[in-house]
Structure formats: structure tokens, C-alpha cells
Swiss-Prot record:
InterPro entries: AceK_kinase (IPR046855), AceK_regulatory (IPR046854), Isocitrate_DH_AceK (IPR010452). Coiled coil: none annotated. The keyword Transcription does not apply. It comes from the Bacteria. The lineage of its organism: Bacteria, Pseudomonadati, Pseudomonadota, Betaproteobacteria, Burkholderiales. HAMAP family: AceK. It catalyses: L-seryl-[isocitrate dehydrogenase] + ATP = O-phospho-L-seryl-[isocitrate dehydrogenase] + ADP + H(+). Belongs to the AceK family. One of its GO terms (biological process) is glyoxylate cycle. It comes from Ralstonia nicotianae (strain ATCC BAA-1114 / GMI1000) (Ralstonia solanacearum). Pfam families: AceK_kinase, AceK_regulatory. GO terms for cellular component: cytoplasm. This is Isocitrate dehydrogenase kinase/phosphatase. Keywords: ATP-binding, Cytoplasm, Glyoxylate bypass, Hydrolase, Kinase, Nucleotide-binding, Protein phosphatase, Serine/threonine-protein kinase, Transferase, Tricarboxylic acid cycle. Its EC number is 2.7.11.5, 3.1.3.-.
């Protein structure tokens, strides 16, 4: 039952609400400035600057939340404001959002500040935004008509598809020359023709393109959609910058599954300038209807909004399901206790209180490793994690075996309380949540020969891409990797992760005598950061099918020279290009230097 006041009589309530909104507005202004800065760094080819910008931006939100919390404590003694005033604060905040362009994100910021000040017994819709209050539908950027959320183009007109695409590219006003834009436009037109074949143009044939570029790694992406009749198709064009400073269109992505991979939870967040983020999410959801809005917000760099939406979706699922949380199937970890809800496609990971040998780590060190992954370029090979504190679950939904495991291995992380409805709850004090995947060891054990080969190709590629991004996984057992819905192999166990540049890549020394040669134990000295690629075959090549596929596709994996070459390149300051699509899709591999052909549209107009 709601206890909202009938009258808004408190000046303090309004001032507190205004202070919180000012804090959010400052955050979002800085957030947008990062995206504008990303364009200049891309044009200059300053990849280290882009990486640093990405890392810095992740910290902005928490910095502004702390800043706002301190102001409220210092100026309004927020911890001692009574309940009636807090209810008025929320209502004033709602009123201030009436014409706001990012109301959903502002509500989340409000929650973040309040949960730093209020006890968790206040975490209900009377005091925070457990549910959204302001609709984000049809918010328009009326103050800046020159830059709408997206622009519409009509390739069925006289200029044709080629001219239309060229205008799309020029409208982004990139301050760097193209190597050969007519050639690249020709490639795009050719690829469109090959993909759609005999494509008849309907009267409503048009292309919508989001007004801002999407920056990530060393690429800038044009994101749009093609509308023809009652069909909508994705359109994504990555722009790359060569060593000579010239730009090129690298490929065109036209399949829904390609867009899903581009916006996957295994990639770093995009930097994109959005006046109205909800409009971008709506646009992208039209192209990826099965992708949760939470994941789209997160991929756009609004990870706190994504986290908030995920939790709302999770609570909704709990209300409409009855299965129990259970210990996750598979090999139990030494560091994490992992559980899952079978009807929900995620796993929950709790750091244990004690770590048996040979693990030598601490809770804080493990958390720092997960933060490292959050801030690093995940290059499509490391799963993103959602981190929560003090999460209350219905105790009746926990399997008895799971409760015993939690009390045995992580007692400091478990509390019990009475819920608002009088039911018993179990509170997990700290938990990571990740997408559930098929463990690679199970995939390899149960798969067909073709699946085993695919899994090993992907595993080798994943490791090579990770070390190219300066990530050494540490524990490379197959159980620490998962296979996504799209068949990509992804790393998800981060407690032993290191920078490759901090590792000493070594050859196994030659034995000095027969005793050393026959020894079943390591007889040579091993430093804390030493790695020996020649020894990896011992625990990776036991299965004959795996061994055959591994040596056929990744024989260099066990050669220290391959690892050392990556380390040397990183130490020299070189940045690797990572592609969120198969290399065979790149125009340089698909068409080479072949003539692009006529850039006129190959599409035929449908009969009226």
C-alpha cells in the first residue's frame, strides 16, 4: 500500500531532489563529453587515449554518486531526514523529470544515492524507484532539431543506393580522409546485392541511421536499419583507420546474428553520444527484439541503468516462476561458489571465505581482478559481470543443498531476515552475476567431432585474442571457458588473470641429467609470474579428438615464441585490431583489390 503524502510541503524535500538531479545532470554531461572526445581520438588514431577514456568513464558514475551523497550529508544531514520527507523527495524528483531527456537514467541515479544513505529496509517503491515512474516513449529532442535520434534516407530515389550510402558517411563529418570511399561504397553495394539477391523495392523503402557513431576498440560503427515493405533489416558498417591515417569501410553487417554478436555481453561498452538514450535503445531493440533492454543499455556504456533493469527483470521472473536455486552443474571451483536458477539464463557467483591449496589469494584481490576485466577491452572473449551487494532472495526458493554449501563455504556472505511481506529471506552480501553458458569441457566431452573441432578452433582463437589484448587468463583449463549461444568461446573465470606484459614467457630448460629428465615433478625454478607454454599440452591434449584438432589448428599455441611475440608487440606500444565479426567478412578478404563495380543500386522497384 502506498503511503505517499497528499501535500508537498517541505522545502528541504525539493532541495534534496534538485541536488540529486543536478548530480545526475553533471554525470550525464561528462558521459556525453567522453563520447565527443572519442571521435577526436579515433580521427587521430590515439588508441591508448581511447582505452584510457573508456576506463575513466566507467568510474564517472560512482564518483558522481559519492559526490551527491556527501553534499546531502553535509548540507541536509540526509541520514536523519524522516520518512515523510523522503517520500516527498521522491515525488519532487518525479516532477523535475517531466521534460527530462534521460528520466530512466536519472531515476537509477536517485536509487544509487538513496541506497548509499538509507537502510535496505527502505528499498521499496515508497522511497526509491523499484519501478519506473516516467515513461520514455516518444521523447523527442525538440531543442536540437539538427541532430535527431536517427536520420532517414531514401535510396530508391534518383541518387540510388550508392549515392545514398555516400551521403550517410559524409554526414558524420569525420575529420580524416578516406583511402578510397567510392571503392568502399561499391563494396557495400555489392555485398548488399549478394545478400538480398532479387530484392524488390517497396514504396516505403528507406534507410534509418542513428545520428551518432559507435566507438569501440579501433573502430567506429555506423548503425542503422533498412525498411522495405513490412520487413526491417539491420545495417552496420565498421569504419577502420589505417596506419597512414586514412579511413576505410571494413565491411557491412546485414544479418541479425551479426548485430547480436556486435552488441554481445562479451565486448567492451560502446562510446556513443546520445541525447535521448531510451530512443537509441528502442531503435536497437527493433533490430534485436530478443535482446533484453538491460543488455542494450549496458552495451551503450550505461551499465548502471542496465544493472537496474536486469534486477527488475529478475524480480519479475521470480514472481512468475517456482523452481529453486541450485548449485550450478559442473566442476566446483576453488574460489567461487556458483549457483543458478534453471529457468533463468544466468549464474550467481559468490566468493568463498576460504581457499584451499594451491590457491593463494584474497577476497579483495579477486574483486580487483573482476574490476580489471570490467575496465579492460574484453575483445568479445570475456563475459561481462553484474556486481550486486545485499541482494535478498526468498529463502523458500533456495535448495537445501545450496544453503548448506553457502553456510559451509561463504558464511560471511549470508544473512537471514524477515521480508516486508513477513516471509523469510536470505541475503547474499556480495554476488557476481554472469550469463550462463555451456562449459567448454562439457561441450568437448559430449560434442560431435565437428563440434569438438569448432570448440578447439574457438578456444585457440579466444586465447590468442586475449593475449593480443594483454590478458593472460592464468588458469586455462577448459572448465574456465564457456560456449555462447552463437558458438563463440568465452573466458569467465578471472581470479588468476594477469597482464601478459607482467608475465615472464619461458622455455622449459633442458634437463641436465637423467634424473631430471625422468622426474615426475618440476625440477627447475619457477617464479610467481613465469609461464611455460610448452607445458600446456599436459592438461589440454588428453582427449585424442581434442589433441588432433588442437595440433591441426593451433600448433603454435605451445611455442613460447608466439607468446613472446605478442608480449613484445604490446611492450612496443602497438595496438591490435579486433573484429566483432568473422575476418572472412572483411572487404579486404572478401573482394581484395577487385573492382567494386557500378555503385548504382542493384535493387528493383516493386510494382505499386
Amino acid at each position: 500500500m502506498s503511503h505517499f503524502p497528499k501535500l508537498l510541503s517541505s522545502q528541504i524535500a525539493f532541495d534534496v531532489a534538485r541536488t540529486m538531479l543536478d548530480g545526475f545532470d553533471k554525470h550525464y554531461r561528462l558521459f556525453r563529453e567522453v563520447s565527443v572526445r572519442a571521435k577526436a581520438l579515433f580521427e587521430a588514431g590515439d588508441w591508448q587515449g581511447l582505452q584510457q577514456l573508456q576506463r575513466d568513464r566507467i568510474a564517472y558514475y560512482d564518483e558522481r554518486v559519492r559526490e551527491a551523497s556527501v553534499i546531502l550529508e553535509d548540507e541536509y544531514d540526509a541520514e536523519n531526514i524522516d520518512d515523510e520527507i523522503w517520500r516527498q523527495i521522491k515525488l519532487h524528483f518525479i516532477g523535475l523529470l517531466t521534460n527530462h531527456h534521460q528520466p530512466e537514467c536519472a531515476e537509477t541515479f536517485f536509487n544509487s544515492v538513496c541506497t548509499r544513505i538509507l537502510h535496505r529496509s527502505y528499498f521499496n517503491n515508497d522511497f526509491i524507484f523499484l519501478r519506473p515512474a516516467i515513461s520514455t516513449e516518444y521523447i523527442e529532442n525538440e531543442e536540437s532539431p539538427t541532430k535527431p535520434t536517427y536520420r532517414a534516407y531514401y535510396p530508391g530515389s534518383r541518387e540510388g543506393l550508392g549515392g545514398c550510402l555516400e551521403r550517410i558517411v559524409h554526414n558524420f563529418q569525420l575529420d580524416a580522409p578516406f583511402e578510397d570511399l567510392p571503392r568502399d561504397i561499391g563494396y557495400v553495394v555489392r555485398a548488399v546485392g549478394e545478400h538480398f539477391g532479387d530484392f524488390r523495392i517497396a514504396p516505403n523503402f528507406q534507410i534509418h541511421v542513428l545520428s551518432s557513431l559507435f566507438f569501440r576498440n579501433t573502430a567506429a560503427y555506423i548503425i542503422g536499419r533498412v525498411i522495405n515493405g513490412d520487413k526491417t533489416y539491420p545495417l552496420a558498417v565498421p569504419i577502420m583507420r589505417g596506419a597512414d591515417g586514412q579511413l576505410r569501410l571494413d565491411t557491412v553487417l546485414l544479418r541479425p546474428e551479426q548485430l547480436l554478436i556486435l552488441f554481445s555481453f562479451t565486448h567492451s561498452y560502446f562510446m556513443v553520444d546520445m541525447e535521448i538514450p531510451s530512443a537509441y535503445v528502442t531503435f536497437l531493440r527493433d533490430l534485436m527484439p530478443r535482446k533484453p533492454r538491460a543488455e542494450i543499455y549496458t552495451s551503450l556504456g550505461l551499465q548502471k541503468q542496465g544493472k537496474n533493469l536486469f534486477y527488475r527483470d529478475f524480480l519479475h521472473h521470480l514472481q512468475h516462476s517456482s523452481d529453486k536455486f541450485i548449485i550450478a552443474p559442473g566442476i566446483k571451483g576453488l574460489v567461487m561458489l556458483v549457483f543458478t536458477l534453471p529457468s533463468y539464463p544466468y549464474v550467481f557467483k559468490v566468493i568463498k571465505d576460504y581457499f584451499p591449496p594451491p590457491k593463494e589469494t584474497t577476497r579483495e584481490l579477486i574483486k580487483s581482478k573482476y574490476q580489471l576485466v570490467k575496465q579492460h577491452d574484453r575483445v568479445g572473449r570475456m563475459a561481462d559481470t553484474l556486481e550486486y551487494s545485499d541482494v535478498a532472495f526468498p529463502l523458500s526458493r533456495f535448495d537445501d543443498a545450496l544453503i548448506k554449501e553457502l553456510e559451509k563455504h561463504a558464511p560471511s556472505m549470508v544473512e537471514y531476515q524477515r521480508g516486508a511481506d513477513g516471509s523469510d529471506e536470505i541475503v547474499i552480501r556480495h554476488v557476481y552475476i554472469e550469463r550462463r553458458m555451456t562449459p567448454l569441457n562439457i561441450w568437448l566431452h559430449e560434442g560431435t567431432d565437428a563440434q569438438v573441432e569448432h570448440g578447439i578452433i574457438e578456444y585457440g582463437n579466444a586465447i590468442k585474442e586475449l593475449i593480443a589484448a594483454n590478458i593472460f587468463p592464468g588458469d586455462m583449463l577448459y572448465k574456465n571457458f564457456g560456449v555462447t549461444r552463437h558458438g563463440r568461446v568465452v573466458f569467465y573465470d578471472y581470479d588468476e588473470i594477469e597482464y601478459l606484459t607482467d608475465c615472464n614467457v619461458r622455455d622449459v630448460p633442458q634437463p641436465r641429467n637423467e634424473e631430471e629428465e625422468m622426474s615426475g615433478e618440476v625440477w627447475y625454478s619457477v617464479g610467481p609470474h613465469d609461464i611455460f607454454p610448452q607445458t600446456y599440452g599436459t592438461f589440454l591434449l588428453g582427449d585424442p579428438r581434442v589433441r588432433e584438432a588442437f595440433l591441426r589448428h593451433h600448433a603454435d599455441f605451445f611455442d613460447p615464441a608466439m607468446w613472446q611475440a605478442h608480449k613484445a608487440r604490446l611492450l612496443s606500444g602497438q595496438t591490435h585490431d579486433f573484429y566483432a565479426y568473422d575476418a572472412s567478412e572483411r572487404f579486404v578478404n572478401r573482394y581484395g583489390d577487385s573492382a567494386p563495380g557500378n555503385a548504382a543500386t542493384p535493387l528493383r522497384r516493386a510494382a505499386a
